[in-house]
């Protein structure tokens, strides 16, 4: 499990090549999705907020969704969402924006299932 978490976090940092390494950050959320219907709803929610962030003027900031292979026997934290942020300031501006807050409020019942039991980390470039 530790290897999986480490590899996903390294991959998250590697995926964010849209900003300088000194400024870019990633938010990493590990959680469990209980069924495929919930997964589909959650993915649709992420697509919606990615579109909203682009409309707000932040097209290089977005969420990606990952899951372990079906053959992986890990019992917990089988799913992961990675937020890709060009800077700490952009992260704050986006999360404070009325459109982001409206999306979060609209989806709070859907996303609360994942947030309640998640392991969350905000990762910064090491160099």
Feature roles, as predicted:
Residues 11-12:
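Repetitive helical segments and hydrophobic/amphipathic motifs
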Residues 106-115:
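Short, exposed beta-strand-loop hairpins at the edges of beta-sheets
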Residues 1-4:
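Positively charged n-region of N-terminal signal peptides that target proteins for export
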